[in-house]
């Protein structure tokens, strides 16, 4: 069973951004968008060799999160993104005049009555 370990609100005004980071000691991480934004959340695989280009162009119609070391998602209002906490992610600079607002959270596995993880 997973439980929320922490939860917080992000209010990114014009010019605000977040650099690449991970969420250690978590089972899952997520973000729920309360507003739309043209500026994406960006993901980067933690293993450098995955981030270097090694796919054969002849086999790739278009790059996506399954065949790339980096990708992005443009936030849409009322959208929930859940991702592994070890996945590097950052938020692009908000260049809009309105605030970008989201709720982020992490989960952990709940210990059983003997203090052990299931």
Regions found by a protein language model. Name each.
Residues 1-7:
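A short coil-to-beta-strand element that immediately follows conserved catalytic motifs
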Residues 18-21, 89-96:
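Short beta-strand His + acidic residue motifs that chelate non-heme Fe in jelly-roll/DSBH
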Residues 10-82, 113-118:
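Catalytic core of non-heme Fe(II) oxygenases with the double-stranded beta-helix
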Residues 5, 26-28, 37, 99, ...:
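Residues that flank catalytic or metal-binding motifs in active/ligand-binding sites
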Residues 9, 91, 105-107:
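Short beta-strand element of the conserved SAM-dependent methyltransferase core
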Residues 30-31, 97-113:
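A short hydrophobic beta-strand segment most commonly corresponding to one strand
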């Amino acid at each position: 069973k997973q439980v929320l370990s922490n939860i917080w609100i992000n209010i990114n005004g014009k010019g605000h951004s977040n650099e690449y980071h991970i969420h250690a000691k978590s089972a899952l991480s997520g973000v729920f968008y309360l507003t739309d934004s043209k500026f994406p959340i960006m993901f980067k695989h933690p293993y450098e060799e995955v981030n270097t280009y090694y796919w054969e162009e002849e086999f790739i119609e278009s790059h996506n999160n399954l065949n790339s070391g980096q990708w992005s998602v443009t936030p849409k209002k009322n959208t929930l993104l859940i991702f592994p906490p070890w996945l590097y992610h950052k938020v692009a600079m908000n260049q809009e005049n309105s605030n970008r607002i989201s709720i982020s959270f992490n989960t952990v596995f709940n210990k059983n009555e003997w203090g052990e993880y299931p």
